[in-house]
Amino acid sequence: MTLFVEAIEWIFAPERASGALPLREAISTHLLYTLIAVAIAAAVAVPAGYLIGHTGRGRGFAVALAGAARALPSFGLVLGLVLIIGVMYKVEASITAFVLLAIPAILAGAYSGIEAIERHVIDGARAVGMSPWQLLVKVEAPLGLPLLVGGLRSATLQVVATVTLMGYVGNWGLGFHIVQGIQLRSFDQILGAALVIVVLAVALDAALAIVQRLVVPAGVQRRSGTTRRRRRPAERLSAT
């Protein structure tokens, strides 16, 4: 309990506003690299996921690729890319690693969102004369958006935690304070920086959870509400 109090005091100490890397700057850098990595991963994974979900081709390869990518050790991937690309490009190498780690969750969310759409909805859209492009843009993409945002949530949580590793390859992000705390055996600094990362991750997840709820089409919300109301009388009868 004493260590927790000391960690809170470390976070709000006046010294956090100055020094080698002020806490506010560390948070901004941590958040910036997270958003950059997720945005690049989304630019790659969303079109690929929509193509797989729309055509049904390449799903097995995508599942295998996503599974293999999730098994990659984050720390080894970051350090390996830094050594391969070069120490002069530490930021670029680190962001590349974060992008590779974020792609599987976004890819899965993109194609599973389209696959989850009921078949009669797709058949109805084709019956009214929609082209494949119109079907994707007007039907599949909007209905699959909640699962896509769910994939973005998973990717964001993974990346915001993994960006901490940048503290081992450079003086960036909140990982810098953790690495510095390990070197100085300053446990309040380690815990304080970790708590800030947790708060940042929870805030991002909560924001994306709200977005995920808002992107559910109104018709789907009404239908799910009607389904729940229909089930309740049946549940009462089964209970009696």
Regions found by a protein language model. Name each.
Residues A43-A48, E92-T96, L100-I122, L145, ...:
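Membrane-embedded alpha-helices of multi-pass transport/permease systems
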Residues L174-V211:
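Hydrophobic alpha-helical transmembrane segments of polytopic membrane proteins
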Residues M1-T2, W10, L21, A206-T240:
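Transmembrane alpha-helical segments of polytopic membrane transport and secretion proteins
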Residues G109-L148, L174, I178:
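Short cytoplasmic-facing helical segments at TM-TM junctions of multi-pass membrane proteins
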Residues L35, W133-L165, G192, I197:
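Transmembrane alpha-helices
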Residues M1-V38:
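Periplasmic/extracellular loop-to-transmembrane helix junction in inner-membrane transport proteins
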Residues A48-L81, F98, A108-S112, D123:
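Cytoplasmic-entry segments and transmembrane alpha-helices of multi-pass inner-membrane transporters
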Residues P22-Y33, V82-A105, G144-L145, Q189, ...:
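Loop-to-helix entry region at the N-terminal start of transmembrane alpha-helices
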